[in-house]
Structures are given as structure tokens and as C-alpha cells.
């Protein structure tokens, strides 16, 4: 018996049991199967309602609900695949780690978690559901980082070449606010399928040239990861964009429609929504130290977390020395011999779980145990400073630009490969 029949039988059995008492009422409905998991109609409705509410607040025109539901289903398929990957990796986001992330989010808005709760509940959304959605977002980010990072390599020669380009650009470098629409093509597409996709891409450009609203067209037509956000990629410099985009965007004026640009993923359409001079932003660097414990067959998740919790208790009571504990117990070979210490670095270079925890700390404060894709950590913030403009800082920035460019390209390839290897069935949603 396949999964769809099994689910149908289960729903039918419940209905028959209830029929002796009252007419059955449909509480929810399975609208998709992703490997051994399911997508529920209620999950689709939640995303659609959130997009519609945001559009209403911004006075933005949206396509029909049917189109929004298709995009919501696509997002849930990708999210489900990554959550399944997280389960296979043994990756879980603890409540304490989630609370630290929520505290950082609330702090950015000038408030506390209690203030954030009031805002969420004031919008008509359950705070518990919001917490779980953030937990999923953190999880999928860490899954992607763990799987895509190892596919990205930046050579010293590439860094040298980019530094020369940046030097020649001087202060004249520009940043572009980019909108993006992807008309995707399957990896094994036939000539007819490619021609059909090209025709659709040309039609989209035609609509945009007629000054149709970009976000609405992106939501209704794009297969890109930001489709439900209206295809908004945000501000980026030429050196931060995927190579295909950079060559086409350079020198374009505000309002320019570019494309279709062909890649292995499909046909890309870009709109230059605005142009500005590069914003010089001073970044804050941190110096920190940490201890990493990796769960294993011998050491369970709970024992690893409990072990670090004991370290934290002793450290706060001045009964232990951080450097000695790191040298003896930490399983991060790069820092253990140095007493767990990380030299000055931009915290955004760390994985999200580590970054968010570090940024939530005060100087010399030690965190509670938290989980990343590498294992369980505790971290202490030793000091902060405004990044200097040394040659090494420039080199680090160039490396970061190249890494981010390649990461964006590879993350799409990885998601496409994962989707093609999965068993996905989508059923009609009857309204």
C-alpha cells in the first residue's frame, strides 16, 4: 500500500468512527508527499496568508491565490527535503539555542522576546508557531551551509585577481538593488522544453517592458528561492553577484531589464531597481574562545550538552580554567591547542548558530551550550573592535566576496540535485 493510500485509509477510518456520532469534519488535508514526509494544506495556507498580509501592508498587488499556493508548495517541498537531511545528519536546534536567536532578533528591533511575542500575537499569529518556523529556518540554513561549504573553493590567485579589480575601481564601485526571476529548466530537459522555457522568459520580459509590477510577476512566474519575496535579492556589488549576473549588470542604469540569461538552472531575468555608490560600512570584529563536543555512538546528544553545561557552571563559579578545558576536551583541532581561542574575525564568517550566539553575548560572558552542524559548543566573547583597513582585512573581504558568490551559485545547484533525487508527489488543492 503506498503512502497516499495509507493516508487516505487513515482519514477514512477516523471519519467512519466519527460517523456514528456526527458528520465528519475535515481538519486538515495532505496535499503533497516528499519522500516519507507529507505537506499539509494548513502549512500552505499559513504561507499564503502571511504573504497576503505583508502585501496588504505594503499596498502591493499580488497574483491569484492559486499562483501563491503553487509557490508556497514549492517552498515547503524544499524545506521538507532539508529538514529530512537535518534528521539524517542528527542536526537539532535546541530550545536554548532558539531562544538565543529570538533574543538577538528582538534586540535588533530594540526590544525583548516578550516584546517580540506581543508583536507576533498582535498580528494574529501564534507565537509558538512562529518559534517553530524560526527553528526550521535556522535548521535549513545550517543544513545548507554544511552541505554547500565543502563544494566551494577559493584560490589565493582568485583573491589576488579580485584585489586588483577592487583597487582599479577605487571609490567608484557601485552597488545594485537587484530583482530576479528564474524560469527553470530540468537538468534533462528536451529541446522542446528548453524552447518553451525561453518563450516564457521572453513573455516575462515583454510584461516587464510594459511596466508591469516586478514583484507580482516574480511571485507568479519565478522558480527562484526568493519568488515569494517578489524576487528581491537586495543590494550587492558586481564582485558579490554570480558571475553570470555581474557581466550583464555592470554599468546598467536604474530600471534596466536584463535577460534572458541562460545558465544550467534555466533562464534568468534581472531588473536593476536602483543604483548607489558603494556603502562603506565599518564592521565589528570579535575575539572569542570556544569548546566543541561532538556527539557520537558512545556520547549521546544529551550527554554532550550536559557535559558542556557542567563546564559552564564551573567556569562561572571560577572553579575551572577555560583554556585548560578547551585543550583537554575540545574537538575543534584548529583552536583546541590554543585554549579554544579564535583570533579577530568578522562574526558573520561563522556558521549561523555560532554567529548568533556570539553576537548575543556581552564581553567576557560565557554562553549556554548550543548546537551547530559540528556538534555542541560553548563560547566566550573576549573582546570586540571596529575592523581596521589593513591589507589582511582587504584580503579577507575579497575572499568573503568570492566565497559568497560561489556559495550562491552552488547552493542552487545543490538544492536542484536534492530535488531531482527525491520522490515528490503533489495533489490538487480543492477550494
Curated annotation (Swiss-Prot):
The listed locations are: Periplasm
- Protein's UniProt keywords contain Iron: no
EC assignment: the record states 5.2.1.8
Q: Out of the domains of life, which is the source?
A: Bacteria
Instruction: Set out the biological process GO terms recorded for this chain's protein.
Output: Gram-negative-bacterium-type cell outer membrane assembly; protein folding; protein stabilization
Gene3D superfamilies, per the entry: 3.10.50.40, Porin chaperone SurA, peptide-binding domain (1.10.4030.10)
**Residue ranges annotated for the PpiC domain, each copy included:** 173-274, 283-383
Q: Name one GO molecular function term.
A: peptidyl-prolyl cis-trans isomerase activity
Q: What GO CC annotations are associated with the protein?
A: outer membrane-bounded periplasmic space
Instruction: Show the PANTHER family listed in the entry.
Output: CHAPERONE SURA (PTHR47637:SF1)
Name used for this protein in its record:
Chaperone SurA
Amino acid at each position: 500500500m503506498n503512502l497516499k493510500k495509507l493516508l487516505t485509509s487513515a482519514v477514512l477510518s477516523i471519519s467512519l468512527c466519527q460517523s456514528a456520532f456526527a458528520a465528519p469534519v475535515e481538519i486538515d488535508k495532505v496535499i503533497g508527499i516528499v519522500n516519507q514526509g507529507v505537506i499539509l494544506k494548513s502549512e500552505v495556507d499559513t504561507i499564503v496568508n502571511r504573504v497576503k498580509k505583508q502585501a496588504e501592508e505594503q499596498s502591493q498587488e499580488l497574483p491569484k491565490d492559486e499562483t501563491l499556493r503553487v509557490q508556497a508548495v514549492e517552498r515547503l517541498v524544499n524545506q521538507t527535503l532539508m529538514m529530512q537531511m537535518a534528521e539524517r545528519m542528527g542536526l537539532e536546534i535546541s530550545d536554548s539555542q532558539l531562544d538565543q536567536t529570538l533574543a538577538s532578533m528582538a534586540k535588533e528591533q530594540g526590544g525583548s522576546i516578550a516584546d517580540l511575542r506581543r508583536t507576533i500575537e498582535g498580528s494574529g499569529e501564534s507565537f509558538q508557531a512562529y518559534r517553530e518556523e524560526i527553528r526550521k529556518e535556522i535548521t535549513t540554513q545550517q543544513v545548507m551551509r554544511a552541505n554547500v561549504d565543502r563544494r566551494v573553493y577559493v584560490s589565493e590567485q582568485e583573491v589576488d585577481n579580485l584585489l586588483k579589480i577592487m583597487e582599479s575601481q577605487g571609490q567608484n564601485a557601485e552597488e545594485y538593488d537587484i530583482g530576479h526571476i528564474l524560469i527553470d529548466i530540468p537538468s534533462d530537459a528536451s529541446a522542446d522544453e528548453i524552447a518553451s522555457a525561453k518563450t516564457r522568459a521572453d513573455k516575462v520580459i515583454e510584461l516587464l517592458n510594459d511596466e508591469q509590477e516586478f514583484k507580482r510577476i516574480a511571485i507568479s512566474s519565478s522558480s527562484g528561492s526568493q519568488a515569494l519575496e517578489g524576487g528581491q535579492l537586495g543590494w550587492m556589488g558586481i564582485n558579490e553577484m554570480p558571475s553570470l549576473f555581474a557581466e550583464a549588470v555592470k554599468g546598467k542604469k536604474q530600471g534596466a531589464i536584463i535577460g534572458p540569461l541562460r545558465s544550467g538552472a534555466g533562464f534568468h531575468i534581472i531588473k536593476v531597481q536602483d543604483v548607489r555608490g558603494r556603502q562603506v560600512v565599518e564592521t565589528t570584529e570579535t575575539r572569542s574562545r570556544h569548546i566543541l563536543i561532538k556527539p557520537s555512538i558512545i556520547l549521546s546528544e544529551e550527554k554532550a550538552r550536559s557535559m558542556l553545561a557542567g563546564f559552564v557552571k564551573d567556569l562561572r563559579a571560577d572553579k575551572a580554567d577555560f583554556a585548560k578545558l578547551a585543550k583537554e576536551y575540545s574537538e575543534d583541532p584548529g583552536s583546541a591547542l590554543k585554549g579554544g581561542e579564535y583570533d579577530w574575525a568578522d562574526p558573520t564568517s561563522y556558521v549561523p548558530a555560532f554567529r548568533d550566539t556570539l553576537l548575543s553575548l556581552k564581553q567576557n560572558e560565557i554562553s549556554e551550550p548550543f548546537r551547530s552542524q559540528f556538534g555542541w559548543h560553548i563560547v566566550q566573547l573576549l573582546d570586540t573592535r571596529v575592523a581596521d583597513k589593513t591589507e589582511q582585512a582587504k584580503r579577507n573581504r575579497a575572499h568573503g566576496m568570492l566565497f559568497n558568490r560561489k556559495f550562491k551559485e552552488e547552493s542552487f545547484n545543490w538544492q536542484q540535485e536534492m530535488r531531482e533525487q527525491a520522490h515528490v508527489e503533489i495533489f490538487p488543492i480543492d477550494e
